[in-house]
Curated annotation (Swiss-Prot):
FAD binds at R187, T189, W200, S252, H255, R287, R300. Its main location: endoplasmic reticulum. Changing C85A: Alters protein folding and stability. Loss of regulatory disulfide bond formation and increased activity towards P4HB. Changing C391A: Alters protein folding. Prevents formation of regulatory disulfide bond and down-regulation of activity. Decreases association with P4HB. Oxidoreductase involved in disulfide bond formation in the endoplasmic reticulum. Efficiently reoxidizes P4HB/PDI, the enzyme catalyzing protein disulfide formation, in order to allow P4HB to sustain additional rounds of disulfide formation. Following P4HB reoxidation, passes its electrons to molecular oxygen via FAD, leading to the production of reactive oxygen species (ROS) in the cell. Required for the proper folding of immunoglobulins. Plays an important role in ER stress-induced, CHOP-dependent apoptosis by activating the inositol 1,4,5-trisphosphate receptor IP3R1. This is ERO1-like protein alpha. The keyword Endoplasmic reticulum applies. InterPro entries: Ero1, ERO1-like_sf. Induction: Stimulated by hypoxia; suggesting that it is regulated via the HIF-pathway.
Length: 468
């Protein structure tokens, strides 16, 4: 009798467990969980967490930054898209309409931007005007003031400086043209396949301090890779010094950011009358879903946040350069220029207040000789990547690739110029540290792209929430 009652109670208990939900299988992960479950908490080599960045960027910074980037000073970027590829000759040009770039007509660009003196402060501009006037009057060099000669020499020296992390375009070249970035937005162009893979393969395989024996996960140009190769790669990566590991993560973060943009501004529908652009959830999942990418997607997104922190830190450190009274965002429209400078300083002070900035003091520490060599290797590798952008077969992709690598290169230049920035005079020309207009425009637009990516991650997270 006791056994019978025991069996009955056990059976009733099992029925109760099933009916109450206990013992049920867990519901399958949502698509949002597969893409974002690992994209949370603290970032490697940092004291900052993803959630703090999301709140700061999406609600305090993003709206004001977008307003600034829509202004004339930041929307016009001069670029040479016709420079030949320095590494190989067989470039396959993308023939799709969406790959094309529409340059500005001469009368579309404000005169203040086109003038040769836009790079410098008001006092420096006056010195250049003196130089230009002397040249127009046919005066000999001796007629220039000693101060002017010194300024011109210093600027020339700086523009050829070994502190630059990018090989910048010669904007005086007849092939360099102004492009309206708002009319040529970064979005999906259809440029993909072996030609696009080749660009990224050269960047990762030859410029990220990686030996050939170490295989990169999910390399589309390699075959037969598995879990062992992935484990070997990350064991190698973790064994690198912090500088080389950071270099790889910056490039991976930039790659991830670009892929977010392409997924967020995808050509969804095309008719004779219009094109419809929007979020392509499938495209995003193929690039970042933890299962579809064998765990790589979430890692790439965390590297995007790392890139965000690096550029955010650079902007916080360069504030004194823009605070100088004679610095202008000069376009020729005095009222607009003053308003834009106020907005710029407001944004930079907001960035300065960010509580968990990346600490770059761990970079290039230790033995001075070794640190100097490592910094030079770091600079040359990144400079080489900026040259690879001239090999991109899609002109729209080339435009944004050149701008974003120059922007990141400018951020690195700022991070490693702390003493020069601290020693700048409060007014007058800054001989030791200055930024050209090209560097300023690329710096803020590049950060604007990363800021947009972080904002778009919130949009994709919401879109994927109910998809399994």
């Amino acid at each position: 009798m006791g056994r019978g009652w025991g069996f009955l109670f056990g059976l009733l208990g099992a029925v109760w467990l099933l009916s109450s939900g206990h013992g049920e299988e867990q519901p399958p992960e949502t698509a949002a969980q597969r893409c974002f479950c690992q994209v949370s908490g603290y970032l490697d080599d940092c004291t900052c967490d993803v959630e703090t960045i999301d709140r700061f960027n999406n609600y305090r910074l993003f709206p004001r930054l977008q307003k600034l980037l829509e202004s004339d000073y930041f929307r016009y970027y001069k670029v040479n898209l016709k420079r030949p590829c320095p590494f190989w000759n067989d470039i396959s040009q993308c023939g799709r309409r969406d790959c094309a770039v529409k340059p500005c007509q001469s009368d579309e660009v404000p005169d203040g931007i086109k003038s040769a003196s836009y790079k410098y402060s008001e006092e420096a501009n006056n010195l250049i005007e003196e130089c230009e006037q002397a040249e127009r009057l046919g005066a000999v060099d001796e007629s220039l003031s000693e101060e002017t000669q010194k300024a011109v020499l210093q600027w020339t020296k700086h523009d050829d400086s070994s502190d630059n992390f990018c090989e910048a375009d010669d904007i005086q070249s007849p092939e360099a043209e102004y492009v309206d970035l708002l009319l040529n937005p970064e979005r999906y162009t259809g440029y993909k396949g072996p030609d696009a893979w080749k660009i990224w393969n050269v960047i990762y395989e030859e410029n990220c301090f990686k030996p050939q024996t170490i295989k990169r996960p999910l390399n589309p140009l390699a075959s037969g890779q598995g879990t062992s190769e992935e484990n070997t790669f990350y064991s190698w990566l973790e064994g690198l010094c912090v500088e080389k590991r950071a270099f790889y993560r910056l490039i991976s973060g930039l790659h991830a950011s670009i892929n977010v943009h392409l997924s967020a501004r995808y050509l969804l529908q095309e008719t004779w009358l219009e094109k419809k652009w929007g979020h392509n959830i499938t495209e995003f999942q193929q690039r970042f879903d933890g299962i579809l990418t064998e765990g790589e997607g979430p890692r790439r997104l965390k590297n995007l946040y790392f890139l965000y922190l690096i550029e955010l830190r650079a902007l916080s450190k360069v504030l004194p350069f823009f605070e100088r009274p004679d610095f202008q965002l000069f376009t020729g429209n005095k009222i607009q220029d003053e308003e834009n400078k106020m907005l710029l300083l407001e944004i930079l002070h907001e960035i300065k207040s960010f509580p968990l900035h990346f600490d770059e003091n761990s970079f290039f520490a230790g033995d001075k000789k070794e640190a100097h060599k490592l910094k030079e290797d770091f600079r040359l590798h990144f400079r080489n990547i900026s040259r690879i952008m001239d090999c991109v077969g899609c002109f729209k992709c080339r435009l944004w690739g050149k701008l974003q690598t120059q922007g990141l290169g400018t951020a690195l230049k700022i991070l490693f110029s702390e003493k020069l920035i601290a020693n700048m005079p409060e007014s007058g020309p800054s001989y030791e540290f200055h930024l050209t207009r090209q560097e300023i425009v690329s710096l803020f637009n590049a950060f604007g792209r990363i800021s947009t990516s972080v904002k778009e991650l919130e949009n994709f997270r919401n879109l994927l929430q109910n998809i399994h």
